[in-house]
């Protein structure tokens, strides 16, 4: 495979995360669900530094065309980041869903994906909002590859009310509410901010 595609991109993304999270364990996870098989995409899990810390899950391969598929029309691509409060394969399922929809129609900052059920058991959040990766250090937001730039997008679980608020007042207004309340998006039992 050529530079910036397939395995080369996955290797670069993994190295990018290992550099950004030195000393933390990065685990490669593939996926195969009943409804979705994408062997060119996997999830990288960054384990927390300390017990009780947050788990970071990052897609790897969504930013490049599928093998045998049409070539990329753009010189930029996106990978998606989901934060969970504990180790769970549900994060892999959710990222598979996001990557699938991204493959159908490119997801941009401000777009939402309906999960159709709580993102984690007991949560009132059943939608995922694509946002800028505010939790990551600035140098981790983008990875330059030969002929392609990979942008990392945060996937934030939100409620139906928060989704409606963003549609009505805009993403910036919703993100302002997140900031005002000190949103802990990874908390499955959090209340709606609106």
What residue ranges belong to the model's regions?
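Acidic, proline/glycine-rich low-complexity IDRs
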Residues: 1-194
């Amino acid at each position: 495979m050529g530079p910036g595609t397939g395995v080369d991109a996955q290797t670069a993304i993994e190295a990018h995360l290992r550099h950004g999270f030195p000393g933390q364990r990065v685990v490669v996870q593939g996926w195969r669900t009943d409804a979705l098989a994408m062997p060119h995409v996997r999830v990288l899990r960054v384990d927390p530094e300390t017990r009780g810390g947050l788990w970071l899950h990052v897609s790897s391969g969504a930013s490049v065309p599928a093998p045998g598929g049409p070539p990329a029309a753009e010189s930029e691509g996106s990978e998606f980041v989901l934060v969970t409060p504990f180790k769970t394969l549900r994060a892999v399922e959710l990222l598979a869903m996001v990557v699938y929809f991204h493959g159908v129609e490119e997801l941009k900052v401000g777009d939402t994906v309906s999960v159709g059920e709580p993102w984690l058991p007991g949560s009132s959040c059943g939608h995922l909002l694509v946002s800028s990766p505010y939790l990551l250090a600035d140098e981790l937001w983008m990875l330059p590859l030969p002929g392609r730039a990979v942008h990392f997008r945060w996937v934030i679980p939100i409620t139906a009310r928060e989704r409606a608020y963003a549609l009505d007042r805009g993403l910036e207004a919703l993100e302002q509410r997140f900031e005002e309340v000190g949103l802990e998006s990874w908390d499955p039992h959090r209340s709606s901010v609106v």
